[in-house]
Amino acid sequence: MDQFQALIEPARQFSKDSYRLVKRCTKPDRKEYQKIAMATAIGFAIMGFIGFFVKLIHIPINNIIVGA
């Protein structure tokens, strides 16, 4: 029985700690959620433009190298 308890105790402690953490956390309010969503959208747009311009620059360079 002691071996069984020693095996189960870490999982039980982890579940108790996880439950306590979730109960302590708070959901973001509407203003905070909109701020996070806007920052994420701006980040996606910036990364998209960077990828587009890199592709735009490398297409002519690739055509020069392959076409030669």
UniProtKB/Swiss-Prot annotation:
Keyword Endoplasmic reticulum listed: yes
InterPro entries named among the record's database cross-references: Prot_translocase_SecE_dom_sf, Translocase_Sec61-g, Translocase_SecE/Sec61-g
Extracellular compartment residues: 62-68
Cytoplasmic side of membrane: 1-32
Keywords: Developmental protein, Differentiation, Endoplasmic reticulum, Membrane, Oogenesis, Protein transport, Translocation, Transmembrane, Transmembrane helix, Transport
Localization (cell): Endoplasmic reticulum membrane
Tissues with expression: Expressed in the germline. Expression in the germline is regulated in a sex- and meiotic cycle stage-specific manner. Expressed in somatic tissues including the intestine and somatic gonad. Expressed in the intestine more highly in hermaprodites than in males. In hermaphrodites, weakly expressed in the spermatheca.
Record keyword Transmembrane helix present: yes
Chief location of this protein within or outside the cell: endoplasmic reticulum
GO cellular component, one term: Ssh1 translocon complex
A biological process term (GO) from this entry: oocyte growth
Annotated TM spans: 33-61
Gene3D superfamilies: Preprotein translocase SecE subunit
GO terms, molecular function: protein transmembrane transporter activity; protein-transporting ATPase activity
Membrane topology field: Single-pass membrane protein
Record NCBIfam families: secE_euk_arch (TIGR00327)
Subunit composition and interactions: Heterotrimeric complex composed of SEC61-alpha, SEC61-beta and SEC61-gamma.
HAMAP family to which the protein is assigned, alphabetical: SecE
Function as written in the Swiss-Prot or TrEMBL entry: Required for oocyte development and ovulation. Required for the translocation of secretory and transmembrane proteins into the endoplasmic reticulum in vitro.
Family named by the database record: Belongs to the SecE/SEC61-gamma family.
Name of this chain's protein: Protein transport protein Sec61 subunit gamma
Gene, per the UniProt record: sec-61.G
